[in-house]
Swiss-Prot record:
<dbReference type="GO" id="GO:0005886">
    <property type="term" value="C:plasma membrane"/>
</dbReference>
<keyword id="KW-0139">CF(1)</keyword>
<dbReference type="InterPro" id="IPR035968">
    <property type="entry name" value="ATP_synth_F1_ATPase_gsu"/>
</dbReference>
<keyword id="KW-0066">ATP synthesis</keyword>
<dbReference type="Pfam" id="PF00231">
    <property type="entry name" value="ATP-synt"/>
</dbReference>
<keyword id="KW-0375">Hydrogen ion transport</keyword>
<dbReference type="GO" id="GO:0045259">
    <property type="term" value="C:proton-transporting ATP synthase complex"/>
</dbReference>
<keyword id="KW-0406">Ion transport</keyword>
<keyword id="KW-0997">Cell inner membrane</keyword>
<dbReference type="GO" id="GO:0005524">
    <property type="term" value="F:ATP binding"/>
</dbReference>
<comment type="similarity">
    <text>Belongs to the ATPase gamma chain family.</text>
</comment>
<dbReference type="GO" id="GO:0046933">
    <property type="term" value="F:proton-transporting ATP synthase activity, rotational mechanism"/>
</dbReference>
<protein>
    <recommendedName>
        <fullName>ATP synthase gamma chain</fullName>
    </recommendedName>
</protein>
<dbReference type="GO" id="GO:0042777">
    <property type="term" value="P:proton motive force-driven plasma membrane ATP synthesis"/>
</dbReference>
<keyword id="KW-0813">Transport</keyword>
<keyword id="KW-1003">Cell membrane</keyword>
<dbReference type="InterPro" id="IPR023632">
    <property type="entry name" value="ATP_synth_F1_gsu_CS"/>
</dbReference>
Amino acid sequence: MAGAKEIRSKIASVQNTQKITKAMEMVAASKMRKTQDRMAASRPYAETMRKVIGHLALGNLEYKHPYLEERDIKRVGYLVVSTDRGLCGGLNINLFKKLLTEMKEWNQKGVDIDLALIGSKAVSFFGSVGGNVVAQVTGMGDNPSLSELIGPVKVMLQAYDEGRLDRLYVVSNKFINTMSQEPQVIQLLPLPKADDAELKRKSWDYLYEPDPKALLDTLLRRYVESQVYQGVVENLASEQAARMVAMKAATDNGGNLIKELQLVYNKARQASITQELTEIVSGAAAV
């Protein structure tokens, strides 16, 4: 009956693991609702900022800000948003695959790449595969603030201001729904022009007070910060959704494994009982 005891021990072990994954699924579901609320609250601001900036890029401005001017591309920068924790399916690896594909294309063109990493998974990944990491931040938790992101953003903006970067992107996961999260690469600088057909049919002119330079310097930096923050918030919602789905799958798989082990255990127990009965009958016949 040693085999049956071993199987019974495995069943107990899987049941304990199943309890853990079920608890993690419930925690992730609760956190996902909170992050969705935060994402929904910040999204209108980020989208409005994007529209305003799109108007500016199309407009005939009396002051041409450096962030609006295209440059010859010699070096690009990526702000990479990942998670701090794992157990969220292929969320991070899908993001890294998309980024590596883009990096390979730039390398083939002879363009250098700088990376600013947000999240310990990105730090760990690019520590292994290599990359020119110029800034990083980890441990922001479930309630990230803009002040925690200022460091990497400031490093990349300073490099762009000094002409060491010619293009800047943010890479993160876009939350579509609970079952679907999509890696995305968004160009931050130079400012992309609005691609909405209705906006392109209109001409945009603005009056600036007190003066265009002071206003645009502040507005355009706020735009970059808002897009990075929105990327972090959406990535966090994607993380919790992916973790909830992954833990549910693990719980379901645990249930299936328990059923299989229970069947094996019953067969082993039946074989053991049959053997004992055979031995008893054989002993009685010998007497």
